[in-house]
C-alpha cells in the first residue's frame, strides 16, 4: 500500500499532546488589532485545544502524528 500523505498546512498548525489531543493557536490576532482590547488580545495569545468534534478531521490530515 502507498504511504498516506500528511496535509502540510495542518502539520504546521497543530501539535499532538501526550494524551492524544491537539494544540492549536487562537485566531483573530493578525490584523485590525487597534479596536480589540488589551485583555482580549492577551487571552488570544494562549494556545487552545482542538474541539472533540473537529479532532476526527485533524487526525485524518495528520496520519503519522
From Swiss-Prot:
GO CC aspect terms: cytosolic large ribosomal subunit
Biological process terms in GO annotation: translation
Pfam families referenced in this protein's UniProt entry, alphabetically: Ribosomal_L35p (PF01632)
Keywords assigned by UniProt, alphabetized: Ribonucleoprotein, Ribosomal protein
Keyword Magnesium recorded: no
Protein name: Large ribosomal subunit protein bL35
Positions of the UniProt region annotated as Disordered: 1-26
UniProt entry tagged with the keyword Ribonucleoprotein: yes
Residues that span the membrane, as ranges: none
Stored NCBIfam families: rpmI_bact
Composition bias, Basic residues: 10-26
One GO MF term attached to the UniProt entry: structural constituent of ribosome
Span of the signal peptide: none
UniProt family annotation: Belongs to the bacterial ribosomal protein bL35 family.
Top-level taxon in the UniProt lineage: Bacteria
Amino acid at each position: 500500500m502507498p504511504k498516506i500523505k500528511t496535509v502540510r498546512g495542518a502539520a504546521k498548525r497543530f501539535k499532538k499532546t501526550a494524551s492524544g489531543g491537539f494544540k492549536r493557536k487562537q485566531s483573530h490576532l493578525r490584523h485590525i488589532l487597534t479596536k480589540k482590547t488589551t485583555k482580549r488580545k492577551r487571552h488570544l495569545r494562549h494556545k487552545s485545544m482542538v474541539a472533540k468534534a473537529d479532532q476526527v478531521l485533524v487526525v485524518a490530515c495528520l496520519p503519522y502524528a
